[in-house]
UniProtKB/Swiss-Prot annotation:
Residues 1-22 are annotated as: Disordered. It holds the Pfam family Syntaxin. Keywords: Coiled coil, Membrane, Neurotransmitter transport, Transmembrane, Transmembrane helix, Transport. The chain crosses the membrane at residues 268-288. CDD domains: SNARE_syntaxin1, SynN. Residues 194-256 form the t-SNARE coiled-coil homology domain. One of its GO terms (biological process) is neurotransmitter transport. GO terms for cellular component: endomembrane system; plasma membrane; SNARE complex. InterPro entries: SNARE (IPR010989), Syntaxin (IPR045242), Syntaxin/epimorphin_CS (IPR006012), Syntaxin_N (IPR006011), T_SNARE_dom (IPR000727). Residues 289-290 are extracellular. This is Syntaxin. It comes from the Eukaryota.
Length: 290
């Protein structure tokens, strides 16, 4: 039965809030205490990114549903995106430092229990970070497609029909004026429609810049998590083995209790039989003597 690796990791973790810390016996040395403070800090930053991504999704929907461009809302969206980028770079830098420290120690103390703990924590945090950033990337791409759809509908209102390929060419040109060529702006509504088209085009341009900015970091992290796949597999295997061992132990305990109960009942029955036999013998002997 195939199990999700992350689910297997979570099954082995002890944090009650988000199950991100693998349950292990930790050395109480100052070094490990400092390490786990770093882990908590990184986790909080990843959680903050995830929260901001949820807010970005809400802003996307609000902007697209608004009849006219809301500059304040777009400023708030840009602030969220800027904060996500800043925190993502911080998380990546901190994970990189942990990774480098692990690589250095592997050459001197490969069997260290502390080292194994740090490798597991690093792998868990890296995977969670990639999942959050992948969600962010997906929401940006989704917003781009929705912006394209709105541009296409607005162009249709002005009487200009375009294919998806033509629309992509217009967007990639980076020149919003291309959208308005040949369109006569005789009414206020037409002006508003064209302004909305240009606003959506600008949104797409900013999105593509954001995606490019995070692309290299995202690919670097994704490759790191993929390279950790073998270690994650080993963790999953160990977790499953531990679960199987516990279940087997439970079954053995139940069997032992059952067998012990049966043995106790047999012992009582034998004692009762012996008592009855003794009473009969005493009666027989007493009758004979009488």
């Amino acid at each position: 039965m195939t199990k999700d690796r992350l689910a297997a990791l979570k099954a082995a973790q002890s944090d009650d809030d988000d199950n991100d810390d693998v349950a292990v016996t930790v050395d109480s040395s100052g070094f490990m205490e400092e390490f786990f403070e770093q882990v908590d800090e990184i986790r909080e930053m990843i959680d903050k990114i995830a929260s901001n991504v949820d807010e970005v999704k809400k802003k996307h929907s609000a902007i697209l549903s608004a009849p006219q461009t809301d500059d304040k809302m777009k400023e708030e969206l840009e602030e969220l995106m800027s904060e996500i980028k800043k925190n993502a770079n911080k998380v990546r830098a901190k994970l990189k430092v942990i990774e480098q420290n692990i690589e250095q120690e592997e050459h001197t103390n490969k069997s260290s229990a502390d080292l194994r703990i740090r490798k597991t924590q690093h792998a868990t945090l890296s995977r969670k970070f990639v999942e959050v950033m992948n969600d962010y990337n997906a929401c940006q791409i989704d917003y781009r497609e929705r912006c394209k759809g709105r541009i296409k509908r607005q162009l249709a209102i002005t009487g200009k029909t375009t294919t998806n390929e033509e629309l992509e060419d217009m967007i990639e040109s980076g020149n919003p004026a291309i959208f308005t060529q040949g369109i006569i702006m005789e009414t206020q509504q037409a002006n508003e429609t064209l302004a909305d088209i240009e606003a959506r085009h600008n949104d797409i341009m900013k999105l593509e810049t954001s995606i490019r900015d995070l692309h290299d970091m995202f690919m670097d992290m994704a490759m790191l998590v993929e390279s950790q796949g073998e270690m994650i597999d080993r963790i999953e295997y160990n977790v499953e083995q531990a679960v199987d061992y516990i279940e087997t132990a439970k079954m053995d305990t139940k069997k032992a209790v059952k067998y012990q109960s049966k043995a106790r009942r047999k012992k009582i029955m034998i004692l009762v039989c012996l008592a009855i036999l003794i009473i009969i013998l005493v009666g027989v002997i007493g009758g004979t003597l009488g």
